[in-house]
Structure formats: structure tokens, C-alpha cells
Amino acid sequence: LSLHDALPILMEELMETLDAEEKLYQELIPVEQEKTRAIAGTDLEAMRRIVEKEHELVDKTQHLENVRKRIVLDIATVLGKDPDKMTLASLADALKKQPEDQRKLQMVHDRLRKTVMQLQDINQSNENLLRETMEMVEFNMNVIRSTRMSSGSSNYASDASEVYGTAPQQI
């Protein structure tokens, strides 16, 4: 198999991998939206289930990311490019002589980028919601602590009978 013949095969593998990655990210969107509802409702059991599902999808995505990196390394080698500088955009530029591959890659790249940006927006909202929820919990804890402290000191009366439950003995 010549280097020239390897490029179409590698491009096909890359396209399949990018499509699979994009589908996994699409699967994450409703999971993250469910997470938003669980955070807002402080539903800890739902959060546990969601985090398990997230981990499962992230593990699959991580695997595909590793496959994609290997394919991009192979493509960079075939094209004589620096693998560390090879991005999907630079690969699309390198494919000027193959406009069909260039167009397909650009379409997949755009879909993937749009999906990832949507996930980032949802994750940012979830992060903000979590921070607000934690601040509210901390505020409530402080109110409870201050209420307990102030109610403990208000038990004292002019005679100590309220504190000790008996009137002081007179001597």
C-alpha cells in the first residue's frame, strides 16, 4: 500500500471516527440537560445516575479521541506535516486537491464544533447553577448556625430559672 493510496483509507477512518464522536457528544446533550434539572431540584439520586451515564459516555469519547489522534498522526506522516500542528482546519487546507474530502471534513468539523459548543454552554450553565446552589446551601447553613447561637444566648433571663429550670436558692 503506497502512501498515496493510504490517504483515502485514513480519511475514511477519520470521517467515521469524527462522526462517532459527534454522535456521542449529541448523546451527552440530553444527559447534561437532565443534569440541569437534577441540580435545580437538588435531586441527589438523579445526579448519581447522571454522573454514571456521563462517565460511560466520556470513556467512549476518550477512546474515540485516542483513535482520532492516531489517525491524524498517520495522516500527518503521509502528508509530511508536523503531527503536533495538524488540526482539522489545517488538514482541510492540506486537502485542497481533494475538494470532496475537504468539503466532507469541513462539514463534519462544523457539526462537531457546533455540538461541542452547545455542550460547553450547557456545562457552563450547570457549573453556574451548582455554584449558586452551593452558595445557597452555605447561606442556609450560616443562618441555621446563627439562629442556634442566638437562641442559645436568649435563654438567659434576669433570674437563672429559665436556664437551669429552677429558681436560684436564696441564702
For each feature predicted by the language model, list its residue ranges:
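Short, small-residue-biased leader/transition segments that mark boundaries at the very start
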Residues: 1-7
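Short terminal interaction segments
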Residues: 86-171
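Generic hydrophobic, helix-prone segments enriched in Leu/Val/Ile
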Residues: 1, 75-76, 139
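Alpha-helical architecture
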Residues: 3, 40-41, 124
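Extended, charge-rich alpha-helical scaffolding segments
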Residues: 8-92, 96-97
